[in-house]
């Protein structure tokens, strides 16, 4: 009996292994509740002459190596600046502790690694569905270690619908999304997206050796990760194949879809490039890109952090973000979805009810109608005076109509805060989702809207709170962000999770029936996606007017 117990203990404690497509066998970590392979390199270090360029697949042998801890996150920038000092005291702690706005340490330029978490005892022949996560962070910060996926895998086992969870690091800020004519002419735009795409190709090549099915991959992400997920739908005008097979069969987008951005060589991207060049001391160099590539990691970090962060004024006018490059992103993203140039896969897309409140906090100096108009003019340089007038009429200074929504006269910490918060949330997230759904005809569509924190002062159901329920807590939100997503990855139908409220498919925002799953602190219910029609018309009658 003792020998049997010893043998059983040894079997339980045995380190898991996986064999890659090239025949290399690697070892992971037995965490009892799951098995982890962490920090596997999928690309050559993007340093030196490879800085800012699309990634090069990793070529060295990994045979016999152990992968038991996360690799360093990619280099990031400070998203706050002096923003922390302007936060109201009752919102400061929540914002600063929000996972989406934390710089993930340690970080390094040699960072392009991938992680695989699978249920315990998974055999190579298991053929499990795969959930491939893309983290958020405003394209300026973040890392795969912050959103580990452990809860997703554990919950999938309890549901009897086991999945393998994959996450990757990708370059952010200037390292991944530097723009400008020099970058465009070299063909190096959107390097961070190329990192993500190469990681997807790594999954296609290797996930079968871990027990995953490469034909059952669901890509998903939150915030910048959600926008990235959308971009992969329209990448190459919707051709998502690799070696003749689709890289993914479904997509989930949590807060984000089309990116309202000018091309790589557009005005604002070029302005940011010039700021980095000047701050780095490369302004007089004959080859400015070569000069930037010759900088130390710390010097480039300082120059990058001198540019406006995601929470700087004017908020959400991001310094670094995906931009049309004419090759992989062939047009503006609204045009691509309108023209049907996307991969045809089932999708889930949803938002938090008060997506804009976090970002509205950076504009507390705007207190009058005149200042609000000037703020909109500064933020949207392509918009005509008439379009700004229409925007001002759609988003009035009536505090009962602003965000946090449905809070009446409360939470108006300045006369313009709720107005600006409503507009920012709708443009980047909530009503952009409606635009996507109205045009996307690529497969079955499901949509959600969370009001789970509607009573939270100042912030309401703020951007990024879904990650708390998805990775760390249990509640009605986690029923969607875990159970329903797991069912979708397995069966392409979130209702297979046994939800107590049937999740209707989405046809159009003008349909007569309920088409939106809504989440609150008490549970799940359905509703109509027909709110704020005047705001929708003001923002999306001519989307390029509001590009950055």
Swiss-Prot record:
| Signal peptide span | 1-14
Catalytic center residues: 223, 355, 463
EC number, UniProt record: 3.1.1.3
Q: Does the keyword Disulfide bond apply?
A: yes
- Residues bearing attached sugar chains per UniProt: 365
Catalytic function, reaction form: a triacylglycerol + H2O = a diacylglycerol + a fatty acid + H(+)
BP terms from Gene Ontology: lipid catabolic process
SUPFAM superfamilies to which the protein is assigned, alphabetical: alpha/beta-Hydrolases (SSF53474)
Give all cystine bridges in this chain: 74-111, 282-291
Q: Give the matching Gene3D superfamilies.
A: alpha/beta hydrolase
Which GO MF terms does the UniProt record name?
triacylglycerol lipase activity
Q: Which InterPro entries match?
A: AB_hydrolase_fold, CarbesteraseB, Carboxylesterase_B_AS, Carboxylesterase_B_CS, Type-B_Carboxylest/Lipase
Instruction: Provide the alphabetized UniProt keywords.
Output: Disulfide bond, Glycoprotein, Hydrolase, Lipid degradation, Lipid metabolism, Signal
UniProt similarity note? Belongs to the type-B carboxylesterase/lipase family.
Q: Output this protein's name.
A: Lipase 2
Q: Which gene encodes it?
A: LIP2
